[in-house]
C-alpha cells in the first residue's frame, strides 16, 4: 500500500535533522499564521499563485531562488565547518553519509533552484518589456513552468525529513548511483526532482524563444534587439537543445534503478562513461545557459552607469552566438582522464581554449564602454567590476584545466571546485545580483538601499576569495573533492581560512537581507521612490513605462526605429509615452488555477509516490497532471479585455505623478 515508506524513513536519530525540522515547522507555522491573521489567502491565490502575469511570476521565481540560496548556503557552510574541524583525530560533527548528502544537495539546489530560478525570474520580468510585448507567448506555460520548478524544490527538501537525499554528488555518477551502491531512496529523490524541474525549464526555453522571435515590437529587427534579449534568446536555444539530453540521461538512470536495465552498470553490457558523456553534453551548455544571461545583465548595466552606449554592439552579439555554438563542443574536458586518447583530448582542449576568445571580446567591450565614461559607482557597478576581476581569474584557471596534461594532475581535486565556483559565483551570482539591484526599481517602484548593497558586495567579494583561493592551493597540494576527513597538516590552515571566507559570505547574505528590509522600510522617501520609471537614465524600452509597470506593460505598443530607441527619443525630446493619445481596449490572458493548483499538486504527488514505489498513488498523480493539461487545453475562458477607459485612467494617473515630481 505504501511501498517502501514506513516510520523508519523519518530520521529521528539524527539531531541535526530533527532540529532543522522543528525550526522549519516553527517558521512555517509563523508564516501561515501571519497570512491567516491578515486575511491574505484569497489575495495570494487570486493575484499571485494563479497569476499568468510575467511580472508576478518573475517575482515568485526570484523569491524561490532566494529561498534556495538560504538552503544551499546552509549546506555550504556546514561543509566548510566539517572540513575545518575534521583533521587528524577529530572526525568532525557530520557522519560520512550525512556529509555526502549535504554536498549532493548543495550542488543540486544551487544549480537547478537558485541559478536557474533567478535567471528565469530576470527573463520573465525584463524580456517582454525590452521587446515591447504585453506578455510572453504562452502565459499558462509560464505559470506551469514555475510550479514545476517549485514542486521539484519541495521534493528535494522533503528528502531532509522523509528518507534521505542522494549521496552521489549533484550529477549522480554511476555506478555509485545504481541500486547496488545506492539502494535507498536518495537517488530517486534526485531523479524525480531533476526530471520535474527539467520539464519546467524546457517549457521556459520554448516560451521565451517563441516570445522573442514572434512578439518583438514593430521595427525591432534582430540588429535592434537589446543585448540582454539576445542573451535570453541564446540561453533559450541552449535550453531547448540541452535539456532533452538531461531528461534522457537521468531517465535512463531511472530505468536502471526501477526496471533493472543495464544502461550504465558495469555488467549486462552497460557503460558508465556513456552517462558521463550524456550528462556533460547537457552540463557544459548548462554553465553557459546560466552565464550568458549574466553577460547580458552587464551589457545593460555598464552603459547605463558609464553614460555611454555599449561599445561594440555587433561584436557582443556575434560573441554571444559563438559561445552558444561552442558550448556544445567542449564537454569532454570534464573527463580527459577517461582514456579517449590524445587526438580526442587535443580537439576538446583546443575547443575549450577557443571559447575563451569571444568571452574575452565581451570583457574588453565592457572595459572600452567604461573608458572615458562618466562612471557612477552605484552598487550595480560594484558587482559588475567585481565580476570582471573574478570571472577573469576563473577563465584563466579554466584555460589551465583545458590543457589535458594539466588536467591529469588537477582532475577531481579542489582546484577544480575552486574554478567552478569562480565562474558560477563570480559570473552567474554576481551577474544576477547586479541585475536585481539594477531592475529592482522597475519591479517595485523604489530603489534598493545603496549603503547596504555595497556592504553586501564587499562581504561577498572578500569572502569569496577567502573561501576559494585556499581551495586552489590545497588542490595543487593534492586534496581531492568530497573528502569529509583528512590527515595532511599542510591542508588544515588553508581550510580554516576557507571557513572564515564562508562566514564572510554569510555576512554578505545578511547584508542583502538587511538591504531588502531597509529599502522596504524607507521606500516612500523622495530619494528612493521611482516616479519617472527611468531612475538610471536607461537606454532600452523597459525604462519607458511606469515603475512598477501596469499589467498591460504598454498602453500603446512602441515602434522601434533604432538601437536604443528610448535613449534617442529622450535626447530628441520625443514623448515616448504618447500622453493624451487615443487608447484602445487591451487583450490580456486570464489567471488560471490549473498550473498552480491541480497540476502542481498532482506533480508533487507523482514525484513523491514514484520515489517510494507507491504505484497506485503515482498513477493518480500522473493522471492528474495529464488530465489537468488536457482540461486546460479545452478551456475557452482564458482571456479578457481591459477597457480603454481603464487604460486611460491608469496612464493619466502616471502622468499626474510625473507632473507632481517635476513640480517638486
Curated annotation (Swiss-Prot):
Sites of the 1'-histidyl-3'-tyrosine (His-Tyr) crosslink: 284-288
One of the record's GO cellular component terms: plasma membrane
Any one GO BP annotation for this protein: electron transport coupled proton transport
Binding site for heme b: 106, 421
Family: Belongs to the heme-copper respiratory oxidase family.
Location within or outside the cell: Cell membrane
SUPFAM superfamilies: Cytochrome c oxidase subunit I-like (SSF81442)
Protein purpose: Catalytic subunit of the enzyme. Electrons originating in a quinol are transferred to the bimetallic center formed by heme a and copper B.
Residues binding Cu cation, per UniProt: 284, 288, 333-334
Keyword Zinc: no
TM ranges: 15-35, 57-77, 109-129, 136-156, 190-210, 233-253, 278-298, 316-336, 347-367, 383-403, 414-434, 456-476, 490-510, 603-623
Membrane topology (UniProt): Multi-pass membrane protein
Binding site for Fe(II)-heme a: 419
Listed EC numbers: 1.10.3.-
Keywords for this protein: Cell membrane, Copper, Electron transport, Heme, Iron, Membrane, Metal-binding, Oxidoreductase, Respiratory chain, Transmembrane, Transmembrane helix, Transport
PANTHER family: CYTOCHROME BO(3) UBIQUINOL OXIDASE SUBUNIT 1, CYTOCHROME C OXIDASE SUBUNIT 1
Subunit structure: Heterotetramer of the subunits 1, 2, 3 and 4.
Protein's name according to its UniProt entry: Ubiquinol oxidase subunit 1
One of the Pfam families matching this protein, by short name: COX1
Molecular function in Gene Ontology: cytochrome bo3 ubiquinol oxidase activity; cytochrome-c oxidase activity; heme binding; metal ion binding; oxidoreductase activity, acting on diphenols and related substances as donors, oxygen as acceptor
CDD domains xref list: Ubiquinol_Oxidase_I
Enzyme class, first EC level, given as a word: oxidoreductase
InterPro entries named in the record: Cyt_c_oxase-like_su1_dom, Cyt_c_oxase-like_su1_sf, Cyt_C_Oxase_1, Cyt_c_Oxase_su1_BS, Cyt_c_ubiqinol_oxidase_su1
Amino acid at each position: 500500500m505504501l511501498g517502501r515508506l514506513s516510520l523508519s524513513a523519518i530520521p529521528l536519530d539524527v539531531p541535526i535533522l530533527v532540529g532543522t525540522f522543528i525550526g522549519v515547522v516553527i517558521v512555517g507555522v509563523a508564516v501561515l499564521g501571519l497570512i491567516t491573521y491578515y486575511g491574505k489567502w484569497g489575495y495570494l491565490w487570486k493575484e499571485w499563485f494563479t497569476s499568468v502575469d510575467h511580472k508576478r511570476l518573475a517575482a515568485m521565481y526570484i523569491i524561490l531562488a532566494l529561498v534556495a540560496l538560504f538552503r544551499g548556503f546552509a549546506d555550504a557552510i556546514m561543509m566548510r565547518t566539517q572540513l575545518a574541524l575534521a583533521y587528524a583525530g577529530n572526525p568532525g560533527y557530520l557522519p560520512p553519509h550525512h556529509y555526502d548528502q549535504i554536498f549532493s544537495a548543495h550542488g543540486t539546489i544551487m544549480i537547478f533552484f537558485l541559478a536557474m530560478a533567478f535567471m528565469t525570474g530576470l527573463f520573465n520580468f525584463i524580456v517582454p518589456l525590452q521587446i515591447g510585448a504585453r506578455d510572453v507567448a504562452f502565459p499558462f506555460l509560464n505559470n506551469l513552468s514555475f510550479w514545476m520548478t517549485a514542486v521539484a524544490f519541495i521534493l528535494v527538501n522533503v528528502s531532509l525529513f522523509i528518507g534521505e537525499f542522494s549521496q552521489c554528488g549533484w550529477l549522480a555518477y554511476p555506478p555509485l548511483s545504481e541500486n547496488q551502491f545506492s539502494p535507498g531512496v536518495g537517488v530517486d529523490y534526485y531523479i524525480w526532482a531533476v526530471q520535474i524541474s527539467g520539464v519546467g525549464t524546457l517549457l521556459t526555453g520554448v516560451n521565451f524563444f517563441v516570445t522573442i522571435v514572434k512578439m518583438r515590437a514593430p521595427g525591432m529587427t534582430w540588429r535592434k534587439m537589446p543585448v540582454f534579449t539576445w542573451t535570453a534568446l541564446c540561453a533559450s536555444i541552449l535550453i531547448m537543445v540541452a535539456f532533452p539530453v538531461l531528461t534522457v540521461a537521468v531517465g535512463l538512470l531511472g530505468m536502471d534503478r526501477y526496471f533493472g536495465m543495464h544502461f550504465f552498470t558495469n555488467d549486462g553490457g552497460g557503460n558508465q562513461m556513456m552517462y558521463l558523456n550524456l550528462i556533460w553534453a547537457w552540463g557544459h551548455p548548462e554553465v553557459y545557459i546560466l552565464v550568458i544571461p549574466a553577460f547580458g545583465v552587464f551589457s545593460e548595466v555598464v552603459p547605463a552607469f558609464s553614460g555611454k552606449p555599449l561599445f561594440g554592439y555587433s561584436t557582443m552579439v556575434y560573441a554571444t552566438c559563438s559561445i552558444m555554438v561552442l558550448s556544445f563542443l567542449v564537454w569532454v574536458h570534464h573527463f580527459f582522464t577517461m582514456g579517449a586518447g590524445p587526438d580526442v583530448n587535443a580537439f576538446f582542449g583546443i575547443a575549450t581554449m577557443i571559447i575563451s576568445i569571444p568571452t574575452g571580446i565581451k570583457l574588453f567591450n565592457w572595459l572600452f564602454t567604461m573608458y572615458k565614461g562618466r562612471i557612477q559607482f552605484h552598487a550595480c557597478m560594484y558587482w559588475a567590476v567585481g565580476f570582471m576581476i573574478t570571472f577573469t581569474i576563473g577563465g584563466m584557471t579554466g584555460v589551465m584545466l583545458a590543457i589535458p596534461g594539466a588536467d591529469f594532475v588537477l582532475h577531481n581535486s579542489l582546484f577544480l571546485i575552486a574554478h567552478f565556483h569562480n565562474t558560477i559565483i563570480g559570473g552567474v551570482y554576481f551577474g544576477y545580483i547586479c541585475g536585481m539591484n539594477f531592475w529592482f526599481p522597475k519591479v517595485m517602484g523604489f530603489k534598493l538601499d545603496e549603503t547596504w548593497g555595497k556592504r553586501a558586495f564587499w562581504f561577498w567579494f572578500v569572502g569569496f576569495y577567502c573561501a576559494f583561493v585556499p581551495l586552489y592551493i590545497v588542490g595543487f597540494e593534492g586534496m581531492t573533492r568530497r573528502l569529509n576527513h583528512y590527515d595532511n597538516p599542510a591542508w588544515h590552515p588553508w581550510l580554516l581560512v576557507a571557513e572564515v571566507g564562508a562566514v564572510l559570505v554569510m555576512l554578505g547574505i545578511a547584508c542583502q537581507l538587511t538591504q531588502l528590509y531597509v529599502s522596504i522600510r524607507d521606500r516612500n522617501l523622495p530619494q528612493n521612490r521611482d516616479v519617472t520609471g527611468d531612475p538610471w537614465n536607461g537606454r532600452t524600452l523597459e525604462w519607458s513605462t511606469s515603475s512598477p509597470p501596469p499589467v498591460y506593460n504598454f498602453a500603446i505598443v512602441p515602434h522601434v526605429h533604432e538601437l536604443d530607441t528610448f535613449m534617442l527619443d529622450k535626447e530628441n525630446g520625443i514623448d515616448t509615452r504618447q500622453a493624451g493619445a487615443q487608447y484602445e481596449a487591451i487583450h490580456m490572458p486570464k489567471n488560471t488555477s490549473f498550473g498552480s493548483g491541480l497540476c502542481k499538486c498532482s506533480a508533487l504527488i507523482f514525484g513523491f509516490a514514484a520515489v517510494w514505489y507507491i504505484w497506485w498513488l503515482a498513477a493518480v498523480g500522473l493522471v492528474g497532471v495529464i488530465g489537468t493539461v488536457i482540461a486546460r487545453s479545452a478551456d475557452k475562458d482564458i482571456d479578457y479585455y481591459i477597457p480603454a477607459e481603464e487604460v486611460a485612467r491608469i496612464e493619466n494617473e502616471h502622468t499626474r505623478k510625473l507632473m507632481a515630481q517635476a513640480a517638486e
